Amino acid sequence: WEIFFGGRVNEGVVDGATFIINPTNGSSYTWTILQTQQIASSRLRALEQGRWVVQVSPTGFSAFVGPDGAVYDRTGITNRTISEHQISLRTGRTPYSRLGNNAYFWALLVGLAIVIRQRSRAFQRAAS
């Protein structure tokens, strides 16, 4: 379940992980809602970290997720299969890896500052 928590995945990357593995078991959950969320979380972690994610599940979706968030070779629920996909090992850190969730906070602050500045200028022009 660690794939749902960006900080936990980031710890592995900081420690030198060159790809991310997501072993999971969704047997307690009916239908595909949770398994679909896990694939979405794997895509998000791949984008955040610039790494391949290999999701392996005996009861849910198994898949390879590229650093660009593209999903490859996704299996169906409970499909028994052996999947192979060529992945590249990656090093280095993305801005998200360096800033963590603070990246979203800083982006929000910068966006707010731009909006406030533009409104302030418009107000000053209207007052002149």
Residue ranges with predicted function:
Residues 1-128:
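Solvent-exposed soluble domains appended to multi-pass membrane proteins
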